[in-house]
């Protein structure tokens, strides 16, 4: 086992793969684990970052804290030099959320006086200015995230968002001198919120705070920390800067596309994909709940189609509001169970490419497939890599958060995983 520098814990699987992809892009060899690894995991000597994917975003608070601390303690036993709590670039956490409680618990456990709160991911339009989180130039609370079915975001000010959850205070340091930030943080534990509008801002933040033993944020900052690491210590990787060679992003065999996200971008991606002639099957909450639709019936339909059929539960805000009258948690659980079951059956029947849209859906799919460790390959879009289970080298998984990717994302993912790419 090599010397582990970065130890990252993410609150869902797509967030974990997002973070891992930015580390790989920076030149940091990375392995991703689905859940806390058993015993002492084995990975290559070159590995410098370990990312652990949990499913704690909407978990009851006490369980989320306990599981997250267990993951961080595992990383400390791997002798990780720096710990990182990865959450979504749109924060995705209400007053009942877990970002604050988990970060508080880590700071208490290791006597950490302060850390940063940096959800920004400029390449995907997530930026912070004067403590306000923006999505493509629009304050978070005025963006489509306002109507997220599980974590509706009704406030754009990061101070308010974190202080609703945390025992500690938060301070906006904006674009002020990082030197002054140290004095701002003196005293009781607190969170510092710098301006972060560009990748250059990320590099500046990483340069000043890069020696902290614990940081929090999105994949933008972890990418900047990766670049700092490579600048200081060099990189083992050459050529594609990927833990999996480019030519191995492809796999022969049939593909299945699953979409459980109701984000505005996923809805556009579905429209683009079906507009290109893709066959699709929509899951309806009432029919899933009364048994008219189930895994076996839907998979029988899939087997009658050519490769690349789309199964989706994604709905407009209006349709979503109607379906939630059936019980928000009940509907969400049934949809996740169905899509995960379809992924499992597809893998059992020899499908080698599974594309998934939606963070909660992706977490359910990875749990259903049962693979624990993944190598990270090249990215279909920023933060969305092609992944290969170490236990099944023929399978390619592409799992994305709902808002990530281009409108033609599904087509791109199928093309990238279905043909040989030019070796470097």
Predicted regions and their residues:
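C-terminal structural cap/anchor segments
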Residues: 302, 307-357
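Cap/lid and interdomain-hinge subdomains that line or gate substrate/regulatory clefts
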Residues: 2-5, 48, 64, 72-204, ...
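N-terminal basic/disordered segments at the start of proteins
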Residues: 2-46, 66-67, 120-123
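Conserved, well-ordered active-site substructure
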Residues: 351-352, 360-409
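A structural-propensity feature for long, helix-poor, extended segments
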Residues: 48-56, 305-307, 388-424
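Glycine-rich, highly charged phosphate/nucleotide-binding loops
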Residues: 36-39, 60-74, 338
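Short acidic, glycine/serine/threonine-rich loops at helix termini
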Residues: 19-21, 95-99, 126-134, 184, ...
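Conserved, well-structured core segments that form the ligand-binding/active-site neighborhood
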Residues: 136-301
